[in-house]
Amino acid sequence: RNVQMVFQNPATSFNPKMKVRDIICEPLMNFGLIKKKEKDAIARKYLEMVELPGDFVDRYPHNMSGGQQQRVGIARAIALEPEIIFCDESTSALDVSVQKTILELLVKLQKEKQIALGFICHDLAMISSIAHQVAVMYMGNIVEILPGEKVTEEAMHPYTKALLQSVFDIHMDFSKPIEPLEGEVNGATGEQKGCPFQNRCAYCMKKCQEEKPELKTVGEKHELAC
C-alpha cells in the first residue's frame, strides 16, 4: 500500500473492460478503504488532481490518448496515498511534448503530497534535470550514486561517462565520432568474479578481475564502485 507503481505502458496495465472509475478505485476497494457508492466521487477527485475532466470516469482505456492513460495511471498510484511511487520508464512511450507535461505533473504531485518518486529510466538528460539523487546501474549492480544536478560534471565511473557520451546534445562536437564500448556484455544470469564492467572497461586491471568493487564515498552525496 505504501509503495505504488506507474508503468511504462499504461494501456497494458489496465483491464480494457474496466472504466476509469473502477481503474482508479480498485486499489481502494481491495484494501476496504471506500464503499462502492463512493467510487464516483473519489475517482473524480483524483482525476482533478491529475488535471483530467471528471467525466473521464465513464471512459474505457481505448477511449483515451497515451498521455491521458498515463495520467489515469498516476491517479491510480496516488489514490492509496503511498510514501513512494516508482515510475518505470513512465514517459518513454509518449511524445516529447506529452513527456514534459507528465513530468511536470509528477513533480507537482511530489511536492504537494510529500511523496518520494523513484524513476527507472535510461534518459540521463531528463533524470539529471529532475532527480535529487541518481543511481547508475550496470548488469544489476549500482556502480555510482551522485546528485542529479552533478551527473554531467562529476560522473567518475567509466560506464556513467560512456552513458553521458552517448547522449546527443546541441552543444556537442559533432566532428568527433562516438566511440562505442569495446568488449562483450556478460549474461545477466552468469556469475562473474570481480567488477561487472571489467570486460568493457578501458582501465581494467588485474585487481578488477579478482575483486568486486564496493560503493565508497568519494564526495558529498557521491559514491563510487570502481
Briefly describe each language-model feature range:
Residues L146-A225:
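Charged, flexible cofactor/metal-binding loops and thiol motifs
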Residues E38-D55, L164-Q165:
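Conserved ABC ATPase "signature" region
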Residues S90, L94, V98-K176:
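P-loop NTP-binding/switch modules centered on Walker-like glycine-rich loops
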Residues M18-E38, E51, L146:
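ABC-type ATPase nucleotide-binding domains, specifically the catalytic core motifs of the NBD
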Residues E81:
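Conserved catalytic motifs of ABC-family nucleotide-binding domains
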Residues Y60-M64, Q68:
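Conserved ABC ATPase signature
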Residues I85-D88:
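Catalytic Walker B motif of ABC-type/P-loop ATPase nucleotide-binding domains
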